[in-house]
Every structure is written in C-alpha cells, then in structure tokens.
Amino acid sequence: MAPEIHMTGPMCLIENTNGELVANPEALKILSAITQPVVVVAIVGLYRTGKSYLMNKLAGKNKGFSLGSTVKSHTKGIWMWCVPHPKKPEHTLVLLDTEGLGDVKKGDNQNDSWIFTLAVLLSSTLVYNSMGTINQQAMDQLYYVTELTHRIRSKSSPDENENEDSADFVSFFPDFVWTLRDFSLDLEADGQPLTPDEYLEYSLKLTQGTSQKDKNFNLPRLCIRKFFPKKKCFVFDLPIHRRKLAQLEKLQDEELDPEFVQQVADFCSYIFSNSKTKTLSGGIKVNGPRLESLVLTYINAISRGDLPCMENAVLALAQIENSAAVQKAIAHYDQQMGQKVQLPAETLQELLDLHRVSEREATEVYMKNSFKDVDHLFQKKLAAQLDKKRDDFCKQNQEASSDRCSALLQVIFSPLEEEVKAGIYSKPGGYCLFIQKLQDLEKKYYEEPRKGIQAEEILQTYLKSKESVTDAILQTDQILTEKEKEIEVECVKAESAQASAKMVEEMQIKYQQMMEEKEKSYQEHVKQLTEKMERERAQLLEEQEKTLTSKLQEQARVLKERCQGESTQLQNEIQKLQKTLKKKTKRYMSHKLKI
C-alpha cells in the first residue's frame, strides 16, 4: 500500500440509504491510491451474530467495525478497512464488513440479496458467520446463496441460460469459510468424532428423494457445493458469560475463554495464510484501482436494474486500463527516444534503429499492462500512434538536418559570396580560381560531422542557386576560348545531373528503408501479440481445467451419495424381504406341525 494510505479505522464503501446502494467517493479515493495487489475478505451473516468482532481481529484491533450491544443492526451497507497484509509483503488486506442480513425492520430481503451478492463478487474469501450449529434453520437462513443464479451473470451473452451461465461461477467465486459462533455441541456424527471441516461436509450431504421437501433441503447445499469448491469451517465457543458480551470489544484476551481466544487466533492465521489475492478471469490480479472499478461497475448495474455481469465488469475495467496502458507505452517511447536520439541523425537507418528498439520496449510495456483487448483495438491504436511518432521524428530529423546544413553553408560559403560581390573572380583566369575555391569549400562542408540526411540535397540546392553566378564568371573569363567555355558548361550540367541522380537514389534508399521498417514494426507487434495470446490461452485452459475438475469432483460426490443412498435403500429392502421370508417360513413350519 502506498505510504500515504493509512486507515486508522473502517469507512463505509457502499452506503445503503432508503433501499438504494451508493458507492462512497471518499472510500473509492482510498482504493484508487492502493497500487498493491489486494486480498479481499468479506463477511456476511445474520445481524447481531458478531461478524464485526472477527473483522476487527483480522485488522489487528479490538475496536473498529461497530459491534453494537443491542438487537439493532449497526452496520449499514458495506464497510471497508484497508490494512497492510500481515503475512504477504507488498499486499494490502481489504476487509469488508457487511450489513447484517435478515433485519426485520428492512421489510424485504431485496437489499440483503444484493449485499450478499456484492460480498461474493468483490471478495477473494467469503466468510459466512452464523450462530450455533449447521441445522436446517441455518441452511434456510443461507437461502441467499440459492439466489445467486438470479443475481449474477458470468457472461454478457443474452442467450446464456442460468444453468450454463452459473456453471462458470466457480472460476471467479471466492473461497468459502463458515464460522459457527457460540458452538456448544460435540463435533461428531454417528458416534464418530469430526473435525470442523468434516462437520461442514457432513452437513452438506444431500438427502435422497424427489419430493419438494427433499428439493428444498438439497438446494442450498447443492449451491454451496457447486459454487464454492474450496470450503473451510471454524467453530467458536462462547467467549464469555452472555451478560458481558456487550463489553466484548473492551475486554482483553486474558478475560475471555482461552479456548475461544485460540479459536479466533486459528481463524485469523488461516485467513492470513490461505486467502488469495483477488483475481479476475485471465489471471488478472486486482489492485486498489481495479477494485474501485469493480465496485462502480456492479453498483451501476444494480442501479440500472441490470444483473452484475463478471464479463462486463472485466471488459469495463479493460477499457480503462488498456487506454492507460497505451498512454504508459507512449510515455515510455517518448522517454527513451528523448534520451537516445540526437537530431539530426547521421543516417535514416540510425534513427530507425533507435525507433525500433524504443517501439519494442513500448509494446512490451503495453502488453504487460493490458488485458482483454477485444479485437486488439488498443494495440492497433498504439501501433498507429507509434507509427505517427516515427514519422514525426523522421520529419523533425529532416528539418534539423536542413537547418544544420543551411547554417553550415552560410558559414562556409559566405566568404566566397563576398569575394564574388567584390569582383575578385571577374578577371582573366578568375573562373578557374572560383571553381577551385568552390571545390575546396565543398570538401570542407563534407568534412563537417552530423549534417544528417539532407546534407547532399541542401548542398545541391545551394549550388544550383549559384549556377547563374558561376555562368557569369565563366562568360567574363577572357582567357578561356568559346570551345572551353562550352565544355565547362557541359561539365557543370553533367555534374548537376549526376548530383540529381544521386539524390534520387538516396530518396529511393530512404523509401526502401521506411518500407522495411514498417514491415519490421508489424512483425514485432505480431510476435508480441502472439506470445501474449499464448500466455492468455494457457491461463484460460488452466482456469477451465480447474472448473472442470471441480465439477467432476462434485458430480462424483453426488453419484457416490446417491449410490450410498440406493445401497442403503436396497439393504433395507433386502432386510425387509428377509424378515418377511422368515415370518412366512415360521408360519409355514407352524402350519406343517399342526398338520
């Protein structure tokens, strides 16, 4: 977490006012400043079951989230507390305490369902807190989990049915932890001792039958098993005498039941060690700004009357981040070119080589910071901007070369121009002296470094502009015969034509270099895109295999339970038949003896 982020206490993240859920701008501002990956732990459960106490312990405090001391629910909406992660360096632990479910004063359960849904969508670990044992009443109170198929969509496709869509929930749902408060029973089943985890699995067993009562019994169990493949259970003794529960946050651990203190420590240790970084489809690790975006996307969807959609949330996040990734890549390119390029470059190839290195690095920056670039629109935008940057540099290089060469010509040839004006060469033999001086100055010009790509063109343009002066000196030179003058004129024309041909050749070379550079640029983008697509494909396959494995395990478990049920039923039928047969045999023997 950034050094300036220090939350001394929790803040409301999602306000619940008059049945309307609204994101708190101040809390979003805090999230936007957290650049580290986040581990998000959310707790849900009925009101007045002590959720806030556990969250305060995870924050390393006795006070923070409001505990309250009456049957009135204190927490409204969803509250957030961001603290440095105690076990994962460079990570931030985001704790979300939710409004108590089932408050009769709220009138209906609509808001409760949305609070539960948001807790599921935003967290990487979901803690469900309840009182006592896992009995049918506890399962009935967890009916919110059965509504998730009506509250969440994984894909944006309107033709996806609920069953197909909900099958993908496991790929992005959080781990599930059930905390049982004031647990007073012995952990056992059929006379055998159980661990809390075994107790949870035992409680999630399905009943055999097809009646409506059986379906109602199985539905919440099936949903928990289907949506949350990784499950954990913790039981907590009563911490202190009930009369003192109201002062729980004021009491020190020494004043509480030692067993309860140890149970809380075990719970916190598990959460710190096992809660994963919040991750989206495609292996995208969530940081503060990404969590902020998810909150806004889900809240806006609920406000519009739409279902929160994971795919849409990821795409909305991708739009923001890919746009920022383009700007980050361009900034890197500008920085690198600014440091490396000295205009004018001696050759076009020198400039293009520097561009290509900077372009490759910029593309790598984009690839590292982008995801879900549908149809590669943002990469195409980046490529277009980099092409324009290259063309701009080429233009600047050309202008810098022209300016440099023009300035050199002014310095080198101005003395000659002054001599021409003074008539020094308007005399017999003056033409030869002029040509010799001209050639000496050209040589001096060529020896000057870093003239750039316009060196020849600017020189030839200058010389062409002085042809009339050269011709005038030639015509006034009385030593030369008319024939010699004609030969000199032809030589000048030949040299001019040769220079023009050289300029055309240089232009063709520049054009060829530009075409080759564009092809190299295209191939580099394709190469990096292909590598990124391969990584994303591997990530997708891993996620799909994980989802498939989870489904197969659940299917095998259901079949096993069904077979066990059928086996038990068959065994009962066999025993019943044996008893019937025994009775008939006894009756037959009795009847036979009478005969």
Swiss-Prot record:
A family per Pfam: GBP_C
Query: Which PROSITE patterns is this protein grouped with?
Result: G_GB1_RHD3
Coiled-coil region: 482-595
Q: How does it assemble?
A: Heterodimer with other family members, including GBP1, GBP2 and GBP5. Dimerization regulates subcellular location.
Which PANTHER family has this protein been placed in? GUANYLATE BINDING PROTEIN
GO BP term (any one): cellular response to tumor necrosis factor
- Gene that this polypeptide is encoded by: GBP3
Give the location in the cell.
Answer: Cytoplasm; Cytoplasm, Perinuclear region; Golgi apparatus membrane
> Catalyzes what?
GTP + H2O = GDP + phosphate + H(+)
Alphabetically ordered keywords of this record? Antiviral defense, Coiled coil, Cytoplasm, Golgi apparatus, GTP-binding, Hydrolase, Immunity, Innate immunity, Membrane, Nucleotide-binding
Indicate where this protein is primarily found: cytoplasm
Any one annotated GO CC term: Golgi membrane
Q: Which residues bind GTP?
A: 45-52, 67-69, 97-101
Question: Segment GTPase domain (Globular): which positions?
Answer: 1-309
Q: Any idea what this protein is called?
A: Guanylate-binding protein 3
Chain ranges of the GB1/RHD3-type G domain: 35-276
> What InterPro entries does the record tag this protein with?
G_GB1_RHD3_dom (IPR030386), GBP_C (IPR037684), Guanylate-bd/ATL_C (IPR003191), Guanylate-bd_C_sf (IPR036543), Guanylate-bd_N (IPR015894), P-loop_NTPase (IPR027417)
Q: In which family does this protein belong, per the annotation?
A: Belongs to the TRAFAC class dynamin-like GTPase superfamily. GB1/RHD3 GTPase family. GB1 subfamily.
Q: Which GO terms describe its molecular function?
A: GTP binding; GTPase activity; identical protein binding; protein homodimerization activity
According to its UniProt record, the EC number is 3.6.5.-
